């Protein structure tokens, strides 16, 4: 089954931030483009079998069906809806960040 992949405003902002950090802070625009391409390719691959990646292990996110897609040093956090055939990308972040804290901030917004 083919799913529609929707990127939230926050996830879009996350992707822009990743690009800007690598391109401008690390002064590596080529690497920034490559990393963004890898992330986008993996995100778009969620149109098929989005349940193939592990569920996030902590509540309340586990009950909501949140899943984790690792992409090199980053994680894509998303929720697949099998009834509507939609995958919603919630966040894209560096894997070394405090994911719980970032999800809590996302919930409060």
Describe the residue ranges of each PLM region.
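Basic/aromatic recognition patch in beta-strand/loop cores that engages polyanionic ligands
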Residues: 49-83
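Enriched for short, Lys/Arg-rich terminal
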Residues: 71-75, 79-109
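Basic, Lys/Arg-enriched alpha-helical interface segments
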Residues: 1-62, 108-109
